[in-house]
Amino acid sequence: MLGFTFFSASMSVGAKLGIGLDLGGFIAAVSIGGAILATFTGALAYVGAKTGMGVDELARHSFGRFGSFLPSFLIAFTQMGWFGVGVAMFAIPTAEILNINPWPIVLIAGGLMTASAYYGIKAIEIVSFISVPLIAGLGTYSMVTATVDGGGLTRIFANTNGMPVMVGVGLVVGSFISGGSATPNFTRFAGSAKSAVITTVIAFLLGNTLMFSFGAVGGAFTGKDDIFYVMIAQGLAIPALIVLGANIWTTNNNALYTTGLGFANMTKRPKKPLVIIAGILGTLCALWLYDNFVGWLSFLNATLPPIGTVLVADYFANRRAYQAIVEAVETGRISAADTSNTSATRAVAWPAVIAVAAGALVGWTIPVGIASLNAIVATLAVFFAGRGVVAKMK
């Protein structure tokens, strides 16, 4: 899971935080946002490990067979968007170095990344394994160099643009709430729920904090709000393109995998052709997404927390039913593939669907507080109120 959080885009978010916040504000934003992400993903990790189900299977129980199309679409759509962001993050600085239009690089990079996700090239797994220590080493070198050359962290962070801390918290949460929402896809194979929660929480607290710190120190020192340009300004252009490019490639593979699963749940079609469609759409939208990066993060921060909130809330509200399904799988009465196709699975669980819509609306429109927390609280309130209404109607 630690490698999962070593994400180049998080370093670019860190660069934006470094330019916008002073040192105290940066620490506060990363601490609060990191705690929200760790709690959110830790709860999802627990549910995934206890049930052995991925996001789409859990969604069919909590949202219903057709209601699950809503979370599947939102998570798949946002992961497809992250794929596009990753393509653009690599293509734009590469094109500037080569002094060419970025579109050829976008199309080539997007095509190669889509092909590797489609064919499941084993070499990409090796690249993923190697890129984690390499990105840690490159980020540490960049951060230490910037700190020494800038005369210390306090001086580096002195010239800020006055970003509100709560905006910074939103960027932190938005940077990984989409990937974090897919946590059960990875922890469903965990040996125990305890180990799944511990590794997930440590990964998000440690991994994300490191990524934000690498980007923030370099961003504050150079005045650049994109990690590629930060490292180019530090004379690290070639290492940045190789190491960060490899990291983007591997994370984009994971993004298309999650996208394919979500679209497959909606269409009941094989996953692989849908991976190609998602890769094409993500590639075509890459430059637009990059140009609207902060708005994209704000959208994710407000709209995605309600999905994971419902998955966790439904599990704890119906723990015995979930446990019965797990026991049925363990005893061979049903197969693991049939866990979400039982007769008890509803067509649409309206309390869940309405709760997500209400939570997203509150997170997007309420101007005070922390958007993700506002969305979570509203989702829980509407979800349990809706369950109460449905229970009285029976």
Language model segments and positions:
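N-terminal signal-anchor module of multipass membrane proteins
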Residues: 1-46, 50
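C-terminal membrane-solvent junction of multi-pass transporters and transport-like membrane proteins
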Residues: 310-385, 389-394
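Hydrophobic transmembrane alpha-helices that form the core helical bundles
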Residues: 68-99, 110, 248-265, 306
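Membrane-water interface regions at transmembrane-helix termini and the short interhelical loops
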Residues: 16-17, 45-46, 89-97, 110-131, ...
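Hydrophobic, membrane-embedded alpha-helices of multi-pass small-molecule transporters
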Residues: 1-11, 143-149, 157-218, 231-253, ...
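Juxtamembrane transmembrane-helix boundary signature
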Residues: 29-63, 70-76, 388-394
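Membrane-interface loop-to-helix entry segments
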Residues: 91, 104-109, 113-146, 159-160, ...
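Transmembrane alpha-helical segments of multi-pass small-molecule transport proteins
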Residues: 32, 69-76, 97-119, 133-143, ...
